Amino acid sequence: RLVGGGSGDADWRAQWEEADRVAEAVHAREWDGIDAEVAVGDEGTTDDETAIEDVDAGFHEGDALRAVAEALPDPATLFVSNSMPVRDLDRFVGPTTASVTALGNRGVSGIDGIVSSALGARAGTTDDLTLVLGDLALYHDSNGLLAVERCDADATVVTVNNDGGGIFHKLPIESFEPPFTESFRTPHGLDFEPLAALHGLEYERIDARPDALADRGESPAERADAVAEEVAAAVSRSHEEPGSHLIDVETDAEASHRTRERLAAAVDDAVHGDAGGE
């Protein structure tokens, strides 16, 4: 048994709390399209406009997680898949005062059995369940949807559908084609609407890929907001209506990965300022 003693190093803790606040401010600027100044420790303030001027590339997969979280009923159970969804939840979704139970399978990479685990959790609670997972995770455990009818486990299933394994963009192999696409990304081209019909789920497709966003607003921020509102509205409707729902959010894995990279660089610049270049 581990026993913690003392209050720890207050200055060390304060530095991390400040860094977290700065990161949230940078993400908020990307999310809301607002101008802001970000306080950075004892060194005064730094205008984060320069740090993130190239970040706002429109809707990305982290926005999907945030939109889902903000549309949850209270109380609610949120089950988030391994791989990129749980990472995006950790990075882009802030704390809430709502009564939300967040669940996930052990580990951050393996995607087997996600649907079954989530619907098993639904069978043990009276809260509305929202499951967020990737398209490969849904494909791997699609037969788990049998529990919707057999166990009377109504659920809202949100698929972040980038047609393959988006997480592998984080590996050096992404620079090598065709092996990267054929053996790592493994695009499948599946249409999940018939799967929803097979298991009696209402189906809704939201195309959030860059080529489909031209009519959603004049700027990237406006287009991102429009799609986020569409995702949030779909989640809200699904919990107001009877039965189970599959909300299929089609995204671009590479574009989302590049946005994550730019956001990470912007946060680093905002936290460290010129010190990072010394």
Explain the meaning of each model-derived region.
Residues 3, 25-41, 264-278:
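Short amphipathic alpha-helical segments
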Residues 11, 17, 27-28, 181, ...:
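Conserved alpha-helical scaffold segments that buttress catalytic/binding sites
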Residues 45-46, 66, 88-278:
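Thiamine diphosphate
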Residues 20-85, 253:
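Active-site pocket-lining segments that scaffold enzyme catalytic pockets across diverse folds
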Residues 1-25, 148, 219:
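Glycine-rich, acidic loop regions that bind phosphate or pyrophosphate groups
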Residues 2-12, 51-58, 79, 182-186, ...:
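Hydrophobic alpha-helical scaffolding
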